[in-house]
Amino acid sequence: MGLSPSIYKDVGDLSSLSTDVIIIGGGATGAGIARDCALRGIDCILLERRDIATGATGRNHGLLHSGARYAVNDQESAEECIKENRILRKIARHCVDETEGLFITLPEDSLDYQKTFLESCAKSGIDAQAIDPELAKIMEPSVNPDLVGAVVVPDGSIDPFRLTASNMMDATENGAKMFTYCEVKNLIREGGKVIGVNAYDHKNRRERQFFAPLVVNAGGIWGQGIAEYADLKIKMFPAKGALLVMGHRINKLVINRCRKPADADILVPGDTICVIGTTSSRIPYDQIDNMEVTPEEVDILFREGEKLAPSLRHTRVLRAYAGVRPLVASDDDPSGRNVSRGIVLLDHAERDGLDGFITITGGKLMTYRLMAEWATDLVCKKLNKTARCVTAEQPLPGSTESRQETNQKVISLPSTIRYSAVYRHGSRATRLLEKERLDRSMVCECEAVTAGEVRYAVDELDVNNLVDLRRRSRVGMGTCQAELCACRAAGLMNRFEVATPRQSTTQLSAFMEERWRGIEPIAWGEAIREAEFTSWMYASVLGLNDVKPLDEQAQQGTDSNEF
């Protein structure tokens, strides 16, 4: 099914394109590969069927893992995480909140596990320090006061949308080309070699072709379907995880449960909110685009979450969302009894006799840069390139200086606008605050998003519609869930020539529907009262119900359940 073109910005030349590498997938891994290729001087084109970070990348905790969670059962993953943790704190510091983290032991948990946990962290190179429970309560006032043990680890939070956008920005500034809402429909083969892809451009309702000697499948869980275009089998087992977004930051530190990984045992503060999760349940592969958070999952998240921080039970919930992990079965065990949570790099020339095709999957958000490095190393080998990887050393756009240094450059601006812009965009914040008076006018009070930030997102971050804008700026992600800012943002989309007046109205309708789909699973108390007020305002006062509703195809283009 096609997506409605009426909510997208038009693009230019639609002729076939040739390049060195085609990358399928616009999540963190795909964006990381595009950046790595571009920095090594390799021409590349990235194709994404929707917007960036709409898959697993945008549907997780946003946890900057120290690796401690994996230390007991998966030392290799733990070592990868702590190494990448240290790298991301340097190259992506404007995306990172260095909160640190606590692993707490409750009376029903075993202190013996804490001992094993500390030993495993030490073996993995993770700085984990046991502290007195009383000190833990001082460091994190929201923590369960009944805790009997606590360990401090170098956890933090990271914004996956910001991280992906920064990688995309660096890639395109170094020569890469990116096409969002461009869905790969088939692989073009010539004998035993993949030479390109057939894609459908949802913005312009037409088919396109892209050619390259090498195609990289970075589609995550959707990579199984992409491989099937070449009659290849990569057996994946989707694991769904549900999460809740709370109305404010309950906790200062990441709070983990010091036990074997289970449901709802991580509470992560990030931006203006915190996220509790996750659950874990296998789902059929044909349901990966139709995930809904169930009442049972909401109950589990509350019941287990309040054991980490009792105040969570009385905190307003803003929305619920769900993601899907790509668990990959080994080739000799298609039943899935031994699925991998590690990085899986497949050279299909060696594995299947099909040249020109690579798959990178598995892993996690924390290891996206390492996954990109592995994939790009293989790309270089196949293209006879010798350039080395520099992504671990070169800062991403926005991280070339500290937030404190950038704040000094815009010190004359109101503090709310200044700190929010610098927090989200780092050293690039000066670009969105220096043009004209309009740029300082407030669009979203909850997240302190200005018209200048909207302009910057449109000019430099490839925004096609309001939902894209949300991922780049947090418009509509605050307490009111777009109630007061969506109409203002829609007007700016027209003013900045992203959309016609009619398209802006259609985008507004789609955007409010997308917000409701995440609110519906937790629609009680303050959330339902706010939703009713929003409905009254947009339907009764602004007449949004008179806008022709988008069909199911269009809703796929504005996918919900992301925080």
Curated annotation (Swiss-Prot):
Instruction: Give the location in the cell.
Output: Cell inner membrane
- Write down any Gene Ontology CC term: glycerol-3-phosphate dehydrogenase (FAD) complex
Keyword Transferase among UniProt keywords: no
Q: What class of enzyme is it?
A: oxidoreductase
* Superkingdom in the source lineage: Bacteria
The catalysed reaction is: a quinone + sn-glycerol 3-phosphate = dihydroxyacetone phosphate + a quinol
Q: Listed GO molecular functions?
A: flavin adenine dinucleotide binding; FMN binding; glycerol-3-phosphate dehydrogenase (quinone) activity
Provide the topology term for how it sits in the membrane: Peripheral membrane protein
Enzyme Commission number: 1.1.5.3
Q: Any idea which UniProt keywords this protein has?
A: Cell inner membrane, Cell membrane, FAD, Flavoprotein, Membrane, Oxidoreductase
Q: Which residues form a coiled coil?
A: none
In terms of Pfam families, this protein maps to: DAO, Fer2_BFD
Q: Which cofactor does it need?
A: FAD; FMN
Q: In which pathway does it act?
A: Polyol metabolism; glycerol degradation via glycerol kinase pathway; glycerone phosphate from sn-glycerol 3-phosphate (anaerobic route): step 1/1
Question: Mind telling me which InterPro entries this protein's record contains?
Answer: BFD-like_2Fe2S-bd_dom (IPR007419), BFD-like_2Fe2S-bd_dom_sf (IPR041854), FAD-dep_OxRdtase (IPR006076), FAD/NAD-bd_sf (IPR036188), G3P_DH_FAD-dep (IPR000447), G3P_DH_GlpA_su (IPR017752)
Residues noted as binding FAD in the record, renumbered to the chain: 20-48
Which one GO biological process term can you cite for this protein? glycerol catabolic process
Task: Read off the NCBIfam families from this record.
Answer: glycerol3P_GlpA, PRK11101.1
How is this protein organized at the quaternary level?
Composed of a catalytic GlpA/B dimer and of membrane bound GlpC.
Q: Which family does it belong to?
A: Belongs to the FAD-dependent glycerol-3-phosphate dehydrogenase family.
What name does UniProt use for this protein?
Answer: Anaerobic glycerol-3-phosphate dehydrogenase subunit A
Give the organism the record lists. Haemophilus influenzae (strain ATCC 51907 / DSM 11121 / KW20 / Rd)
